[in-house]
């Protein structure tokens, strides 16, 4: 459906990818690897705190060093590349990020300490991106790989969730 809509109305990218979900390895459109992240999801109530959750009902506290890599499988033309990558996180003590796009030279970004949601945006045509992150107390949510125009479809993996728990996401998180 995404490919057909993007072919007709424009747009690129696979949309939302959870930062550290093991199920992402089964996606037909993206190769995803990560390290240094611990998954908390609404279906595992013993370790999930609603105050920390995001719209996809998952969050990933990171170790002092973590990484996330995303690479298109190029199976479908409109998901083989994207021109905006947005990493969503909370970094109450700040966060240092080294990024590499399409295997090129690394660039460095630093996020200052903030209590709310922060977004690291990279704009250029790409088919892979690698993040190396360091900082204490940071939580990752996911990465949106998309275009600035056309059709963008985000699929949140809600397996097992009826959706009623979405009402427990703090309003401040939704506003961020």
Regions found by a protein language model. Give the residues of each.
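Conserved SGNH/GDSL esterase-like catalytic core that processes O-acyl groups on lipids
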Residues: 1-101, 105-176
């Amino acid at each position: 459906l995404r490919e057909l809509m993007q072919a007709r109305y424009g747009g690129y990218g696979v949309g939302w990818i959870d930062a550290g979900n093991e199920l992402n390895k089964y996606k037909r459109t993206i190769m995803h690897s990560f390290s240094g992240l611990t998954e908390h999801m609404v279906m595992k109530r013993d370790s999930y705190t609603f105050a920390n959750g995001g719209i996809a009902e998952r969050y990933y506290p990171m170790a002092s060093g973590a990484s996330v890599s995303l690479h298109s499988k190029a199976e479908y033309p409109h998901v083989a590349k994207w021109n905006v990558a947005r990493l969503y996180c909370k970094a109450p003590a700040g966060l240092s990020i080294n990024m590499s796009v399409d295997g090129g030279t690394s660039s460095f970004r630093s996020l200052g300490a903030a209590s709310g949601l922060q977004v690291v945006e990279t704009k250029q045509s790409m088919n892979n991106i690698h993040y190396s992150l360091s900082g204490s107390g940071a939580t990752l949510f996911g990465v949106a790989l998309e275009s600035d125009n056309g059709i963008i479809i985000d699929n949140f993996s809600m397996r097992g969730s009826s959706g009623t728990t979405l009402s427990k996401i703090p309003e401040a998180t939704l506003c961020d």
